[in-house]
């Protein structure tokens, strides 16, 4: 019989007590269910199944908070119940589109405000206040044809143009064979007197494209023929029309880089600007190509009227003369003179 001391018995007793206390904490027990071992990945959750009607507690962990879609079958009942209606989807889409439109509108307003601020700051703040110079802001293109301004009327005599054009028209009519045969020479109207102009109009035509814009100047007491809108002690402004000279713009760009047009080419073409008046002097004060055009009407009798058109630059230059006459209750036009026919 083996002798066991009290010390060994005491050690065995303590070891048994300690192991019985520690092992339940450190060792995981494996439970058996249905004859199969439980998957250790789903100790704290239930494994997924292929049953579409299973509860949420038995679903796949990847779709715990969202409905799953079965492969090869229609969407689950929960998924169908959670689908948004067409009206709700349309409302969401409209809200997103409205938000985008508001954002785009804010961006456009910001860019436009920055552009206007920069233009006004340079035009008024720098050129008018600092440099004390005149500045011009173009707004929109305008027609090349315009009425004579008050300043133009002081430099051009409309009565003189009317009288000279009347003489030139009578000269042309007296040389025409149709007028000589049907009305005779010297030409007389129904009252037996020399025909006179009954209606006459004058206007300007710029050769260069024109724009309408705002002119700014420092506010001063200097007299001017123009009507100004004023902000006292700040600046004054008015609306005006100005031509855009492409050749002058090119000259300015070349001068900025210390190159002149004479270094590149030299073209002399007075016919382009002054036509047949290349040996005449232009009107003083004009810094761009400007034509003064006129249209006149002269009656020969109750059924016959002469209409003529031309340009004025120191002298009158006729472009066209038409005769309008009523024949068999119809208005017939005869072209008596046309400038292109003589070239």
Curated annotation (Swiss-Prot):
Gene: AIM39
Cellular component, GO annotation: mitochondrial membrane
Species per Swiss-Prot/TrEMBL record: Candida glabrata (strain ATCC 2001 / BCRC 20586 / JCM 3761 / NBRC 0622 / NRRL Y-65 / CBS 138) (Yeast)
Main subcellular location of this protein, as a coarse class: mitochondrion
Biased composition (Basic and acidic residues): 54-63
Cell compartments where the protein resides: Mitochondrion membrane
Name of the protein this chain belongs to: Altered inheritance of mitochondria protein 39, mitochondrial
Domain of life of the native organism: Eukaryota
Taxon lineage: Eukaryota, Fungi, Dikarya, Ascomycota, Saccharomycotina
Membrane topology of the entry: Single-pass membrane protein
FT transit peptide: 1-29
Similarity section: Belongs to the AIM39 family.
Sequence ranges of Polar residues compositional bias: 67-84
Transmembrane segments: 108-130
Region feature (Disordered): 41-84
Disulphides: none
Keywords annotated in UniProt: Membrane, Mitochondrion, Transit peptide, Transmembrane, Transmembrane helix
């Amino acid at each position: 019989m083996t002798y066991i001391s009290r010390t060994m018995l005491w050690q065995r007793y303590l070891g048994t007590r300690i192991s019985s206390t520690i092992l339940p904490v450190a060792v995981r027990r494996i439970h058996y269910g249905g004859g199969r071992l439980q998957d250790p990945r789903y100790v704290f959750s239930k494994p997924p199944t292929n049953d579409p009607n299973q509860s949420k507690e038995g679903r796949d962990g990847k779709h715990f908070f969202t409905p799953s879609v079965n492969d090869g079958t229609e969407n689950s009942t929960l998924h169908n119940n959670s689908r948004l209606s067409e009206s709700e989807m349309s409302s969401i889409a409209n809200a997103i589109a409205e938000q985008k439109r508001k954002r785009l509108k804010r961006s456009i307003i910001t860019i436009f405000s920055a552009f206007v601020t920069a233009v006004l700051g340079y035009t008024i703040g720098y050129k008018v206040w600092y440099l004390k110079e005149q500045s011009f802001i173009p707004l929109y293109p305008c027609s090349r044809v315009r009425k004579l301004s008050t300043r133009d009327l002081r430099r051009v005599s409309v009565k003189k143009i009317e009288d000279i054009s009347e003489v030139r028209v009578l000269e042309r009519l007296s040389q025409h064979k149709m007028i000589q045969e049907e009305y005779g020479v010297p030409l007389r109207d129904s009252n037996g007197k020399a025909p006179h102009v009954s209606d006459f109009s004058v206007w300007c035509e710029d050769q260069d494209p024109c724009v309408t814009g705002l002119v700014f100047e420092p506010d001063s007491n200097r007299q001017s023929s123009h009507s100004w809108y004023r902000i006292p002690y700040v600046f004054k402004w008015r609306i005006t029309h100005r031509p855009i000279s492409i050749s002058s713009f090119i000259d300015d760009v070349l001068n900025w880089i210390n190159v002149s047009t004479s270094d590149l080419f030299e073209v002399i073409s007075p016919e382009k600007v002054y036509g047949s008046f290349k040996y005449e002097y232009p009107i003083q004060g004009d810094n761009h190509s400007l034509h003064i055009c006129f249209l006149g009407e002269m009656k020969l009798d109750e059924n016959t009227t002469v209409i003529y058109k031309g340009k004025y630059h120191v002298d009158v230059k006729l472009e066209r003369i038409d005769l309008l006459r009523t024949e068999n209750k119809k208005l017939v036009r005869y072209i008596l003179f046309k400038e292109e026919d003589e070239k």
